Amino acid sequence: MKLHIFNPEHDLALAANQSNYTAPHAGRQLHKDLAFIPALWADENDFVLVDDIDDAYDKVRHLGAIYNKVEFITPLQLSEVFKNTMLIDSIHPWGWDLALVSQLKRLGCPEIMLPTADLLAQLREVSGRRWAAEHLQQDVEFVTDEESLRCAIERRGKAVVKAPWSSSGRGVKYVASPSAFSESNDGKLVAPNLEDTIRWAVKVMKQQGGVTVEPFYNKVKDFGMEFEMKDGKVNYRGLSLFETIKGAYTGNLLATEKEKETVLRNYFNIEHLRNMREVMVEKIEPVLKNLYSGPFGIDMMIYADEEGELLVNPCVELNLRRTMGHVALDLGLSEKSSLHLMRVEYDGNRYHLRVMPGKPSEDAPMH
């Protein structure tokens, strides 16, 4: 029997790298409101950790009785399970980090079921943008001092500066050198004040050891590929067509693989997808073979070059954890009709996972 945990604050916990990390309010709220979602992929009778069992069952019923098959369990109950039984044989969080391991230890989880400190450190390293820059990406550099940062920005004219670890929509700055024009991309303003970005980056360097400097792409559409590492092999699970607002995730298209490929076919020759996938697997599989087991994803991007030709960046981000793209794939398997939208919405008080028929509008395209 498996224990599933939704810890969406994982990316921020990696950045903090502290045993007693407390996420910002928004992260804690998202954790609380969507704690039930592992029920979408858990096996029958698996445990799913939540704070409020009645609330979790109520939410899962709204997604269909097919998901009403798991055992929701509170932290207090989990502590008793660890203390008195051997019911749980493996733990499957959204992502592994020091804060989660410390929490599980406090609940009495046997250490043999948890990653070691050395393994956690390795997972954190591979999860960081520096590792991706050095192993998976092209034309991305990692700088560790202010002078190198200024030179990198001036050399590019316009650039994207990122913290090594951060959640979606955070830890990312769009910047232009004094010699470049200030303009916007996808609603994100290129920082008119270079010095603001420099000060921010210097602070990040002190906390996380450096920042990445990447090309400023004229983005046309986001998409991704979802994988699972199992028994030392990378298995491809499917495409993810997702939507972001100012870099923060808002939703996914639920559709068959053929339908998703049809969407992408409007932008580039999708025969190249297989080659991109094979190249990424060839690079990642040897590294993860003895390090990681579970889901992960790679965010990609369609962009236009200066001549207007559409190209593909095959690795914008490596997410060494479960992703909302995986959730969309699991939900999509159960949908009787295609072209549904899965959205994470905030009503000012709580977060909601909604699934609705339809397709992206022209005003709000689903990337």
What are these language model-derived features?
Residues 1-40, 44-46:
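N-terminal-proximal low-complexity accessory segments that begin disordered
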Residues 28-41, 49-154, 167:
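Conserved N-proximal alpha/beta basic substrate-recognition cap immediately N-terminal to
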Residues 140, 159-197, 224, 246-264:
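Glycine-rich phosphate-binding loop of ATP-grasp-fold ATP-dependent ligases
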Residues 153-176, 201-219, 298, 317:
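ATP-grasp fold ATP-binding core
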Residues 191-250, 302-305, 309-315:
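Phosphate-binding site of ATP-dependent enzymes
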Residues 206-210, 236, 249-310, 353-365:
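A long amphipathic alpha-helix within ATP-dependent nucleotide-binding catalytic cores
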Residues 227-282, 319-343:
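ATP-dependent carboxylate/phosphate-activation module, predominantly the ATP-grasp catalytic core
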Residues 337-367:
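Peripheral (often C-terminal) accessory segments that flank ATP-dependent C-N-forming ligase machineries
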